[in-house]
Structure formats: C-alpha cells, structure tokens
Design a protein with these regions (language model features):
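Zn-dependent metallo-beta-lactamase
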Residues: 1-20, 27-30, 96-99, 103, ...
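Active-site environment of divalent metal-dependent phosphoester hydrolases
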Residues: 29-30, 51-56, 76-78, 93-96, ...
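Pre-active-site segment of Zn-dependent metallo-hydrolases
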Residues: 13-51, 56-60, 74, 110-114, ...
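Local beta-strand N-terminus motif with an aromatic residue
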Residues: 42, 66-67, 151, 178
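Binuclear metal-ion centers of metallo-dependent hydrolases, dominated by the metallo-beta-lactamase
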Residues: 68, 80-93, 170, 174-222
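Active-site-proximal loop/helix segments of hydrolase catalytic cores
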Residues: 109-175
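Active-site neighborhood of phospho(di)ester-bond hydrolases with catalytic His/Asp-centered motifs
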Residues: 22-24, 42-50, 70-73, 131-136, ...
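Glycine/small-residue-rich loop that forms an oxyanion/phosphate-binding "nest" at active or ligand-binding sites
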Residues: 50, 56-114
Length: 222
C-alpha cells in the first residue's frame, strides 16, 4: 500500500518502500499545517510552480535531505543554482524514476517565476496512477489526460478564486474519469473556503468516481 499524507493546501506526500515524494511542500506559514519542515524526510520533491504557497520549503528540504527537485526547467535551474539536486522537465515530457515515472501536464495558471510555466503531474508511483492537477483553471484538453491515462486518483483543486472551483472541478472529473477524486487547495484562507462535502455529493451524484476527503494532516493508505 501507498501512504498518502495531506498537509493542507496542495501539500501532499506519497510513501512506499522507503521512497517518499513530496508535492508542493508548503509547510512554513501554512495555517493548516502541523508538520515541522525541519523534520520532513523525502527522496523527491515535485514543484508545480513557484508561487510561495507551492514551492514552499522545497529548497531548504532539498538541501537538508539531498532530495531531487523535479519541476519545470526554470524552477529546476533555480534550485540547482541554490545547491540542490534537480531534474528539469517541461510540459508533455515524461521521465522514468526508481518509483515509476513522472509526466508533466498543462496547467492554466501563472507561474510565479520569470520565464516559467505552471504545470501538473501524472505520477506513476509503484503502479498507481495519480494525477496532481496543480493550480489550474478548467481546460478542454484535460479530457485528453483522462483519455490517455487510467487515473486511479485525481487530486484536484476546488478552492476557486485562484483555481477552478467545485463546479469546474466536477466537469474535470467528468472528463478525467478517475476511480477516486481527492479535493485539495481549499480552506487554507477565507478566499478559498469551500465545502468538500458538497463537492463529494455532486461528484458522486453525477459521476462514477468516488470522492475521498482527506483531513488536513491526515495519513491514509491508497
């Protein structure tokens, strides 16, 4: 089984067989997080874009642990310039790692870094396919992501204001056709306050997918 921990916002960790991936490791100044970033251990860090609430503690954690930052070329180059191990990619690209593979997907959002783009990830982690959409608006080509991948778990933002909201996320589920949806990027601050329970009700009424609400700082097995 894979251990998934939700540290709030878009901060996720995946662990299996002593390999841990962190995604968008926003610990410091995250009002819903209870984890001390100085105690976090990991092997890889995926960063979807360079806004403070997504790149978060990536540089400090990578320096301390030796973890490899996997991100777009601009973020990877910046991380390397600060003394981190990094692996640069770009939208549409896929690369194999010890745990499986990472493919970089489109996300409609600002980048937070000069010359960069925001992105999402298709993560093949020990034979589970996990789609981390990143901060994104709804876009038509999300249907291609669903068509080309048998998605076990889709991690979708529902907060609105900065990303798609619950109504758009519902449409994304219809196009992606995942087995399970985990809502993220909500309730960190008042502008993105949402009811994941209402989202769950609408998705399960209109789609075949199940919605799994993971409480902040909770770990589950998937």
């Amino acid at each position: 089984m894979i251990k998934l921990k939700y540290n709030g916002h878009a901060n996720i960790s995946l662990t299996k067989d002593n390999v841990t991936i962190l995604i968008d490791p926003f610990f410091t100044d995250n009002p819903v997080n209870k984890t001390n970033p100085n105690e976090v251990e990991c092997d890889y860090i995926l960063v979807s874009h360079a806004h403070f609430d997504h790149i978060g503690d990536a540089i400090d954690i990578a320096k301390r642990t030796g973890a490899t930052i996997i991100s777009t070329a601009e973020i990877a180059n910046m991380a390397e310039s600060k003394g981190c191990n990094s692996h640069g990619m770009n939208i549409g690209g896929k690369f194999n790692f010890e745990f499986g593979s990472v493919k970089v997907t489109q996300a409609i959002h600002s980048a937070g870094i000069e010359g960069g783009v925001a992105c999402g990830f298709i993560i093949d982690f020990y034979a589970k396919t996990i789609y981390f959409a990143g901060d994104t608006a709804l876009f038509g080509d999300i249907e291609l992501i669903g068509r080309m991948n048998n998605i076990d778990y889709a991690l979708l933002p529902i907060g609105d204001n900065f990303t798609m909201g619950p109504e758009e996320a519902l449409e994304a589920v219809k196009m992606l056709k995942p087995n399970v949806v985990i809502p993220i990027h909500y309730d960190t601050w008042p502008p993105i306050a949402q009811s994941p329970q209402d989202f769950k009700k609408e998705v399960e009424k209109n789609c075949d997918a199940k919605v799994l609400i993971v409480d902040f700082n909770e770990s589950i097995e998937i």
